[in-house]
Amino acid sequence: MAKDSSFDIVSKVELPEVTNAINTALKEIQNRYDFKGSKSDIKLEKEVLVLTSDDEFKLEQVKDVLISKLVKRNVPIKNLDYGKVEAAAGNTVRQRATLQQGIDKDNAKKINNIIKEMKLKVKTQVQDDQVRVTAKSRDDLQAVIAAVRSADLPIDVQFINYR
């Protein structure tokens, strides 16, 4: 009997890359003329980004700078879940952005449905925060990878442990 091939579908954000992107974004904010004298800041608290600025307009500018730096570092911005803009101390506004690590149950079901609609001989298992796909044929697995990549999912997915 031939050995089954498999791979895992995961959704991870590399925290060191996020830290590097925050540092370069803060450098740009300090050097930009339109941010001179403003109280703009970005902090990483565990897996939550806290954006702070003088007003909502500057907060959007801070967010744009951060997103551009995250994209340069290949950090998936789909995995950022922005909260509401709220008032903070000292006439500033704050917004929290949560980094989503792992695949939650709803997105795992969506991925499962995408794979089942293909009607290939593959098996899927939801394991905690990842989805394992197993099949006899590697061609089927590559077709699954192509289908999941082309699907419009609310999170960014990576494929690991391809065996």
UniProtKB/Swiss-Prot annotation:
InterPro entries: DUF520, UPF0234-like_C, UPF0234_N, YajQ-like_sf. Transmembrane segments: none annotated. Keywords: Nucleotide-binding. Pfam families: DUF520. One of its GO terms (molecular function) is nucleotide binding. One of its GO terms (cellular component) is cytosol. NCBIfam families: PRK05412.1. HAMAP family: YajQ. Belongs to the YajQ family. Nucleotide-binding protein. This is Nucleotide-binding protein BA_1166. It comes from Bacillus anthracis.
